Amino acid sequence: MAYQSITVSINRIEQILDLPQEPVGNIIPSDNVNQITCTNVSFSYPHTNKVLMNNLSCDFVKGNIYAITGGNGTGKSTFLKLINGEWSSHLSGDIAINEDLLAQINQYELRKNTLGFTEQEPSIVDDTERNNLTLLCKNQPKDEEIINYIKLFNLEKLLLGDDQNLDVRLNERSSAISGGEKQKIAIIRMMLMNPSVMLLDEPTSALDQKSVEVLLNLLKKVKKDHIILLISHDPKVVEAADHTVEL
C-alpha cells in the first residue's frame, strides 16, 4: 500500500477516534410521534468557526411533509442528522420528540423503531436482495409487499429476474448498481420499515422523473400517519411539500 494511502487511512481513523461518545439516554421513545419541536437550536461542527444554525426554532407535526431548503453549505443535511440524534453533544438549544428531549432518549431505540433516514449516497450490503431491502425492518414483511415496491420502482430486472427469488445475493444479477437504483433501494427500505418519522436527504437526485412521481405519490399517501422531512433541489419535490423550512 502506498505511503499516501496509509497516511489518509490513519488520518481517517484518528478523525473517527476523536468523535465524542454518543449519549445514549434512557427514555424509550414512542413509535408514534405526533410532533418534533426545535427550540433555539444552534450548531457548528467541532474545530470550526462556521455556525450552521443559530437559534433555529420550528415545529414538525404529524400528517405533513416538510421541505428543508437553503443554499449549499447552510446545514440542511446536518439538520436532519441532528434530528436523527447525531452530534447531539455539540448542539445547543433543544430538540424534543413529542415531549421528550432528544438528549434524554435512547438513541439506539430511536433509530431502530421511530426514525428512518435515507442518506444522499445509500449503502448496499453484501447480502441477499431480501436482506438489503428489509435492512431496517423490525418485523419481516411479506414477499408480496416487497415485490410490489420492487415493481413500483421498476427494479424487476435488478432484483427479481424471472424466478422472483429474493434470496439470491444482490450482486448476482448485476455487477454494477447505479446511483438511481441505490436511491430506489433506500426508499423501499424506508417504506418497508414504516417509521413514524421519515428523514430523506436528497432522495431524488439520481431518479428519473417517473420514479420521482412514484415517490411523491407514496409520501402523500402515507403522510397522515407520519412526519416527513426531506431535502431536495428539485422544485417539483419542494412544491409537493406542505411546508418549507429555510435554513
Mark where each language-model region is.
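Conserved ABC transporter NBD signature motif
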Residues: 92-101, 110
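Catalytic Walker B motif of ABC-type/P-loop ATPase nucleotide-binding domains
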Residues: 198-202
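Primarily ABC-family ATPase nucleotide-binding module
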Residues: 17-64, 221
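Conserved "ABC signature" C-loop
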Residues: 122-169
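Helix-to-loop junction immediately C-terminal to a conserved catalytic motif
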Residues: 84-85
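Cytosolic ends of transmembrane helices, especially the final helix of ABC transmembrane type-1 domains
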Residues: 1-17
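The feature captures the beta-strand-to-loop junction immediately N-terminal to the Walker
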Residues: 69-71
